UniProtKB/Swiss-Prot annotation:
This is UPF0437 protein y4xE. Belongs to the UPF0437 family. It comes from the Bacteria. Gene3D superfamilies: Helix hairpin bin (1.10.287.660).
Length: 67
C-alpha cells in the first residue's frame, strides 16, 4: 500500500470517528439538562476528532499536490 493510499484510508477512519463524536455531542444536547456534566468531555472528544481529521486532510492535500 502506498503512502497516499494509507493517508486516504486514515482520513476515512478519522471521518467516521468525527461523525460518531458529532452524533454523540448532538445526542447529549438533546438530553439536556440531563447529563449536563458530560458536556465538556464529549465536546473535547469531538473537538479532538475534528482537529485530527483536519490535520489528516491537510496532509493528504499536501501529498496529492506534491505529485
Amino acid at each position: 500500500m502506498t503512502d497516499l493510499e494509507e493517508l486516504k484510508q486514515r482520513v476515512q477512519k478519522l471521518q467516521s470517528r468525527a461523525a460518531t463524536a458529532k452524533t454523540q455531542l448532538h445526542d447529549l444536547a438533546e438530553c439536556l439538562p440531563n447529563y449536563w456534566t458530560e458536556i465538556v468531555a464529549v465536546a473535547e472528544k469531538t473537538f479532538d476528532a475534528f482537529a485530527q481529521l483536519d490535520a489528516a486532510k491537510r496532509e493528504l492535500a499536501a501529498s496529492e499536490n506534491s505529485r
